[in-house]
Amino acid sequence: MTTHRPLFYGSITALITPMDNHGEVDFNALKKLVEYHIASGTHAIVSVGTTGESATLSIAENVKTILKTLEFADGRIPVIAGTGANATSEAITMTKLLNDSGVAGCLSVVPYYNKPTQEGMYQHFKAIAECTDIPQILYNVPSRTGSDLLPETVGRLAQISNIIGIKEATGDVSRVAKIKQAAGDDFIFLSGDDATGLESMKLGGQGVISVTNNIAAADMAKMCELALAGKFDEAEIINDKLSALHKDLFIESNPIPVKWAAYKLGLIPEPILRLPLTTLSEQSQPKVIEALKNAGLL
């Protein structure tokens, strides 16, 4: 049971970035999404992370989207900026542009494609942390990056004062204990895997950076509140209801299914993505509809 809440905790949305028919960011739709999350009890927003299609937005578009999200949030919900890149210099540039913005934290992914060593990862995150006072959250997602940030490297990075936590998206719940042992109990552990998010909280994690939250925000917030209060049996009831969503929102590459689901629920006007991502295929749509019905959303 969590009695003292850390800087980041609970149900944190990995927010989709709505786009119009021309493939441009739809800021009117973005404002409505921010209001939806505030009304639903979401604990924080990650702007332009993986689910927010950061990889296909320019630096200028990323920064503008983060700043507009901050504007729409208006201090009512913390905003965490996705600032990761596989070039350390680019990640530093993004971070510096936000130094005086008011973001509550930065989420920085393990460099993808170039496959650095553990020492390379350490030096990468150290260099980013040294360019800012903004709290930094590491982001480990080997299925996308091709590299695994190991617990012992996390422990080294935890010695840097403004590296305060990790989004751990391996789905390996044993990482909770390993990272806590290496980095200390105060180091924030946020699951990046909806399917194992509640289990990680049972083992000492403080929350979930969630894809499911985009369309089931109130349920995810309630589940995490119950888990933080140690009411795991009640939290499990909600998690069971959402279990098909946790799985089928990854039936195709994220954020393809969740954007289509948000469109189906009327949360965004179009399910548009930027190439090379394309809209959810017709053969996958029935599975997502079934999962939405199981969750009581349709």
Swiss-Prot record:
Question: Matching CDD domains, A to Z?
Answer: DHDPS
> What's a single GO MF annotation on this record?
4-hydroxy-tetrahydrodipicolinate synthase activity
Catalytic center residues: 139 (proton donor/acceptor), 167 (schiff-base intermediate with substrate)
InterPro entries, per database record: Aldolase_TIM, DapA, DapA-like, Schiff_base-form_aldolases_AS, Schiff_base-form_aldolases_CS
Q: Which residues of this UniProt protein bind pyruvate?
A: 51, 209
Asked whether the UniProt record includes Amino-acid biosynthesis among its keywords, one would answer: yes
Q: Where is this site: Part of a proton relay during catalysis?
A: 50, 113
Its chief place of residence is cytoplasm
The Gene Ontology CC terms held by the record are: cytosol
Q: What is its EC number?
A: 4.3.3.7
A Gene Ontology annotation in the biological process aspect, one of them, is:
lysine biosynthetic process via diaminopimelate
- Can you say where in the cell this protein is located? Cytoplasm
Enzyme class, top EC level, equals lyase
The reply to whether Coiled coil figures as a keyword in the UniProt entry is: no
Which pathway?
A: Amino-acid biosynthesis; L-lysine biosynthesis via DAP pathway; (S)-tetrahydrodipicolinate from L-aspartate: step 3/4
Q: Which Pfam family name is an example for this entry?
A: DHDPS
Q: Which UniProt keywords apply?
A: Amino-acid biosynthesis, Cytoplasm, Diaminopimelate biosynthesis, Lyase, Lysine biosynthesis, Schiff base
Record's catalysed reaction(s): L-aspartate 4-semialdehyde + pyruvate = (2S,4S)-4-hydroxy-2,3,4,5-tetrahydrodipicolinate + H2O + H(+)
Question: How is the quaternary structure described?
Answer: Homotetramer; dimer of dimers.
Show the NCBIfam families listed in the entry.
dapA
Question: Which family does the record claim for this protein?
Answer: Belongs to the DapA family.
What this chain does, per the entry, is described as: Catalyzes the condensation of (S)-aspartate-beta-semialdehyde [(S)-ASA] and pyruvate to 4-hydroxy-tetrahydrodipicolinate (HTPA).
Q: What is this protein called?
A: 4-hydroxy-tetrahydrodipicolinate synthase
Q: What gene makes this protein?
A: dapA
